């Protein structure tokens, strides 16, 4: 389970040091092999490779005659890029993925259970604040969330 928020920096080559609290688990569970792809919210999704393979298999087993399925396959699988933690626990983020998410220097890594989201810091702060505001304005939880006692 990956949880928590970490503010990080990209170096001039586009590498990000994975926080040590995740590094050992990633080496144990997937030998440091990760898959990075795009998300419709403007961030990147970072999966341990075995978890990505499970998701990819499920997605690709759907009928691609369905327009939404086909689009999701194109976006997620089409942009999926394998990478590996180097000896210092860093991952190299490919330029096209950095460009998509607007990643330059300051980034935020957000644990999401089976994966991470990787955001440009300014975009993360703006989005997070908007979500809190929307939540305050809505005040009524969805039926799915009511049972969680959050």
Swiss-Prot record:
Subcellular compartments:
Cytoplasm, Nucleoid
Q: Which GO terms describe its cellular component?
A: cytoplasm; nucleoid
A Pfam family (short name) is MraZ
User: Where in this chain does the record put each SpoVT-AbrB domain?
Assistant: 5-51, 80-123
Membrane-spanning parts = none
Q: Which domain of life is it from?
A: Bacteria
Q: Which GO terms describe its biological process?
A: negative regulation of DNA-templated transcription initiation
PROSITE patterns xref list: SPOVT_ABRB
Q: What SUPFAM superfamilies is this protein classified in?
A: AbrB/MazE/MraZ-like (SSF89447)
Q: Does Transcription regulation count among this protein's keywords?
A: yes
Q: Name one GO molecular function term.
A: transcription cis-regulatory region binding
Task: Give the family this protein belongs to, as stated in its UniProt record.
Answer: Belongs to the MraZ family.
Q: How does it assemble?
A: Forms oligomers.
Q: Which PANTHER family match?
A: TRANSCRIPTIONAL REGULATOR MRAZ
Protein's recorded name: Transcriptional regulator MraZ
């Amino acid at each position: 389970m990956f949880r928590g928020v970490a503010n990080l920096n990209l170096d001039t080559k586009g590498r990000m040091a994975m926080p040590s609290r995740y590094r050992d688990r990633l080496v144990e569970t997937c030998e440091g092999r990760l898959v990075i792809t795009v998300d419709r919210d403007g961030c990147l999704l970072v999966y341990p490779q075995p978890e990505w393979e499970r998701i990819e298999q499920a997605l690709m087993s759907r009928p691609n005659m369905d327009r939404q399925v086909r689009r999701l396959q194109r976006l997620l699988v089409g942009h999926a890029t394998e990478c590996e933690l180097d000896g210092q626990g860093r991952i190299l983020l490919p330029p096209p993925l950095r460009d998509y998410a607007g990643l330059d220097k300051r980034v935020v890594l957000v644990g999401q259970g089976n994966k991470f989201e990787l955001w440009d810091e300014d975009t993360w702060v703006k989005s997070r604040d908007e979500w809190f505001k929307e939540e305050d304005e809505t005040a009524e939880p969805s039926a799915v969330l009511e049972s969680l006692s959050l």
